[in-house]
């Protein structure tokens, strides 16, 4: 299993909206950056993703699971970009803010800090566990 982080503006798509769609999940679409799209293509069924609220809040708020691997999304008329389908797994007990992530020296190299504009990024197992621990404080 691999771990990822997905960014969404909560006024466009929030963790609460993800929860409301239930186990059928929802398409994670609209990704038009090539590096982010390539990350979507690497996802496998069962991979887990942190759900990050960008712009408003700037914090990791929950976890979703990949339930369908990359496919060309019908809204992409040029057939260049992909989407995956994800379902809600859980909200974090305590959201983990970008500010607190930046303060943790063990997280200094994660893409959320190094490539702040990237909307889909891998998270290594060590960082995944650190962030989960931070969420339980």
Where are these regions (language model features)?
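Charged phosphate-binding loop/patch that engages nucleotide di/tri-phosphates or the phosphate backbone
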Residues: 120-137
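Short, charged, solvent-exposed linker or helix-capping segments at domain edges/interfaces
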Residues: 17, 95-101, 132-134
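Short acidic/glycine-rich loop or secondary-structure boundary segments that cap or lie
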Residues: 14-16, 58-60, 74
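Short, acidic Gly/Pro/Ser/Thr-rich loop/turn segments
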Residues: 11-13, 93, 130
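Compositionally biased, charged N-terminal/linker segments
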Residues: 1-43, 135-137
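Aromatic- and Lys/Arg-enriched surface recognition patch
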Residues: 61-121
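Short, charged beta-turn/beta-strand-edge "cap" motif at the junction between a beta-strand
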Residues: 52-58
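Loop/turn positions that initiate beta-strands
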Residues: 46-47
């Amino acid at each position: 299993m691999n771990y990822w982080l997905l960014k969404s503006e909560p006024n466009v798509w929030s963790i609460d909206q993800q929860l409301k769609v239930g186990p059928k999940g929802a398409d994670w679409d609209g990704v038009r950056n090539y590096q982010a799209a390539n990350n979507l293509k690497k996802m496998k069924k069962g991979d887990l993703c942190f759900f990050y609220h960008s712009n408003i809040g700037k914090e990791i708020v929950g976890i979703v699971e990949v339930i369908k691997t990359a496919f060309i999304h019908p809204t992409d008329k040029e057939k260049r970009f992909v989407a995956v389908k994800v379902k809600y797994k859980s909200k974090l007990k305590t959201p983990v803010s970008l500010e607190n992530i930046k303060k943790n020296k063990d997280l200094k190299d994660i893409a959320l800090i190094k490539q702040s504009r990237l909307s889909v990024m891998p998270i290594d197992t060590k960082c995944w566990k650190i962030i989960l621990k931070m969420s339980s404080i």
